[in-house]
């Protein structure tokens, strides 16, 4: 009672379709735990503003000291030379 190669291919294809659909259904479960996590907006805003303030302090060096390189090429601000 041997099975023909065509029957084996058909059964394999049907098994592949069923297993792929079962896998996709299993991934479509409930939302992630991060959706239900309560976010404290006040702490997040304070943290974000502290980060922005630090970034602005590093960026606003108007002298010829060490500063982070500018993303565009521009001349440094002119400093008067005392006579």
UniProtKB/Swiss-Prot annotation:
Transmembrane segments: none annotated. Residues 1-22 form the signal peptide. GO terms for molecular function: hormone activity. The keyword Signal applies. Residues 59-83 are annotated as: Disordered. Induction: Induced by excess iron and further synergistically regulated by lowering the medium pH. Peptide hormone required for contiguous Casparian strip diffusion barrier formation in roots via the regulation of CASPs protein expression and distribution in a GSO1-GSO2 signaling pathway. The Casparian strip is required for ion homeostasis (e.g. iron and potassium ions). This is Protein CASPARIAN STRIP INTEGRITY FACTOR 1. The lineage of its organism: Eukaryota, Viridiplantae, Streptophyta, Embryophyta, Tracheophyta.
């Amino acid at each position: 009672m041997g099975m023909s190669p065509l029957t084996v291919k058909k059964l394999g294809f049907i098994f592949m379709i069923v297993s792929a659909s079962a896998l996709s259904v299993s991934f479509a479960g409930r939302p992630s735990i991060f959706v239900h996590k309560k976010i404290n907006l006040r702490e997040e805003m304070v943290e974000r503003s502290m980060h922005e303030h630090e970034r602005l302090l590093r960026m606003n060096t108007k002298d010829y000291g060490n500063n982070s390189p500018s993303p565009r090429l521009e001349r440094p601000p002119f400093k008067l030379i005392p006579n």
